[in-house]
Amino acid sequence: MDVERLQEALKDFEKRGKKEVCPVLDQFLCHVAKTGETMIQWSQFKGYFIFKLEKVMDDFRTSAPEPRGPPNPNVEYIPFDEMKERILKIVTGFNGIPFTIQRLCELLTDPRRNYTGTDKFLRGVEKNVMVVSCVCPSSEKNNSNSLNRMNGVMFPGNSPNYTDRSNINGPGTPRPLNRPKLSLSAPLTTNGLPESTDSKDSELQLSEEKGHSDSSASESEVSLLSPVKNKHPDEDAVESEEHEVKRLKFDKEGDVRETASQTVSGEVSSVRAEETETAAPPPDKDRESRTRQHCTEEEEEEEEEEEEEEEESFMTPREMVPERKNQEKESDDALTVNEETSEESHQMEGSGVSPAQTDSTSERSDSAGASRSGSDCLETQESGGPPSSKTGESVSVPSSMESEEATEVTDDPMEQD
């Protein structure tokens, strides 16, 4: 379609006093019905669109009159004239191209394709005109447009609040250009709520000091990491400022948490130390108790040793007394024998006694000593072992008696001679 030719045909249609169908404009409506592309603005072809819609509704009624039977009880019956006025009123109220323009053009170019009755046709047209969203013409999408539309409302292109931009949610939905910037004096928390006024002054100073040094670096990083956002530098600046404010707030919160944790840990450690001091006994008391136990153990060991020594002292004299007596008696016997032999030798020298007599006397003395020693041993066993002092006395007594007996024995041979 030639846009210039189309615009000339629209101008001629408006200049005519009597409205008639134009083949060029009908061809335009067929093109829109097939492709959905509107190459001109709504204000330019709005008049012809309304004329064509009214004419199609009238022709449909003449060709297919209303049914003679009773209306459907489940559907509200609306007269043709009332429905026609309602549809035309909605279409004239549009300030932009409705997003159902393609389906409306299909109904205008070929009304009997899907409908046979006038009532159903009017309800189908009403359903497609009762919309609020609008679309931009195809020429406005490719080139810069001076008009923007939102829900059928047109805004001038030089408005400072809006710019020409197609949105994901729908074409032609405007987007605000100059968003209100967040002041650094009132930053937002992570929940979106403003912080308390106490920390505003300190955050202002820190943000002003670090803002100048970090602004260039943050902008370069944002531009490198997100190249799509470069189309809106103002938005990037606002986002970078928000990131800086949040980073400063998080740093402060981290410092406050660290100090709080340190203080809490110090208090907990002090409380634990006090509890351990109160619960655990002092080391001096432990040492005293240990020394007392050691002393008692040593005393018990000493008492046991003393008892053992006393038992040994009681046992040894009884056991050793017979042996000592035997040794002392043997030594005394040997001494007495020696003395007797010496005396006999002297007497024999003086008296001239024969050696046979001396031998007999020595044998008698030996037998007498042996009998005496046997009697002494029996006496010691019967008495049960007297102490060492008594044994000494007993030993000394037999020695004197033996000496007397020896003298008597020596005197006997002299008397015999």
From Swiss-Prot:
Compositionally skewed regions (Low complexity) per UniProt: 214-226, 367-376
UniProtKB keywords: Cytoplasm, Cytoskeleton, mRNA processing, mRNA splicing, Nucleus, Phosphoprotein
Compartments (UniProt record): Cytoplasm, Cytoskeleton, Microtubule organizing center, Centrosome; Nucleus
Assigned GO CC terms: centrosome; chromatin; cytoplasm; nucleus; protein phosphatase 4 complex
Main location: cytoplasm
Family: Belongs to the PPP4R2 family.
Name of the protein: Serine/threonine-protein phosphatase 4 regulatory subunit 2
Native organism: Mus musculus (Mouse)
Recorded name of the encoding gene: Ppp4r2
